[in-house]
């Protein structure tokens, strides 16, 4: 497969979060939108073709995940991390933001403390604050070698916190915390 990574696609006026919300988020449009993880490359042919084939059914009803979907995750986790997981431990969510909001709502109660590690993906803040949990900040430490965790502070905070929302690889630091 050969892909053209030099092709520029104008995504303005396509309801693109990355491009069409610059003015409302930043107050101006003449910025490079590096604030959201969104691709600017054409979708791979085999993905586009699969979507087109599915769209040709002319019915867009409710769908479910085949067992093969979850089995591929179980197999990948075992192959790459030697983790023994089970399909019944998994649930599908339509995105990572939905997933960690559901985790906050399902695994903690109002006024529980939740630790996040800024600088961090801004929806982490919303997931804590919007569900009436107490935000506990464990800022990463910027060193000459890169960002590191403040484990001493984390150990103290973990005594009373009910959850740590961890971003790894870290967004926006763009580094894997555990090498």
Where are these regions (language model features)?
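N-terminal small-domain helix-loop-helix segment of the aminotransferase-like
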Residues: 2-95
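Short, solvent-exposed loop/turn segments at secondary-structure junctions
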Residues: 37-41, 121, 170-172
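Glycine/Thr-rich phosphate-binding loops of Rossmann-like dinucleotide-binding domains
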Residues: 100, 124-125, 173-174
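Conserved PLP-anchoring active-site segment centered on the Schiff-base-forming lysine
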Residues: 104-128
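Short beta->alpha connector loops at strand-helix junctions that form conserved
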Residues: 118, 137-142
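A short helix-loop-beta submotif of the ANL/AMP-binding
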Residues: 130-136
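Active-site phosphate-binding strand-loop segment of PLP-dependent enzymes
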Residues: 141-179
